[in-house]
């Protein structure tokens, strides 16, 4: 990607600023999402604001970073965004409920089952910004995090935050 982007005329600084690439210890420009399936983060207005990448094959075993997200930038702040919000906002308002899951593939799986009022905060750290965004559409949030210890802890913490916000 870095090589193709440079051939198209993109400058190194732009590729670094947008988070598509990073520099390794030798100063080489490296593709941030190499070997990963890419999921675009589409903001509430319908514009791509960032990307997430996930290793899906056998290389997942032992990989330190199974998931890689865009770094914070002028247009992307992970704690301000919700994966799938643009596609889900009408269904959330119509159903007066939103399901909050952990990851991109959870959102996609639920959509495949016909459940469209679902978003992900891409991990377990629910933020006040994300709660306020959802509150524009509904006061009814159901947390559907994974059943591991991190998911259970996040669901308890998230429930406390939601109750503090009157939801």
Map each language-model feature to its residues.
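Phosphate-handling DNA/RNA-contact segment within nucleic-acid enzymes
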Residues: 1-141, 154-155
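Arginine/glycine-rich "motif VI" loop of SF2 helicases in the C-terminal RecA-like domain
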Residues: 133, 160-167
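Phosphate/diphosphate-binding loops
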Residues: 147-163
């Amino acid at each position: 990607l870095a090589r193709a982007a440079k051939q198209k005329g993109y400058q190194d600084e732009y590729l670094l600023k947008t988070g598509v690439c990073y520099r390794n210890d030798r100063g080489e420009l490296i593709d941030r999402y190499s070997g990963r399936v890419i999921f675009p983060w589409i903001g509430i207005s319908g514009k791509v604001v960032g990307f997430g990448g996930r290793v899906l094959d056998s290389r997942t075993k032992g990989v330190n970073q199974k998931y890689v997200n865009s770094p914070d930038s002028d247009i992307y702040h992970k704690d301000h965004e919700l994966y799938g919000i643009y596609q889900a906002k009408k269904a959330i308002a119509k159903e007066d409920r939103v399901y909050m899951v952990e990851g991109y593939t959870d959102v996609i799986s639920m959509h495949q089952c016909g459940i469209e009022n679902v978003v992900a905060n891409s991990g377990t750290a629910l933020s006040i910004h994300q709660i306020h965004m959802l509150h524009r559409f509904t006061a009814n949030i159901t947390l559907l995090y994974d059943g591991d210890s991190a998911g259970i802890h996040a669901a308890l913490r998230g429930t406390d935050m939601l109750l503090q916000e009157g939801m």
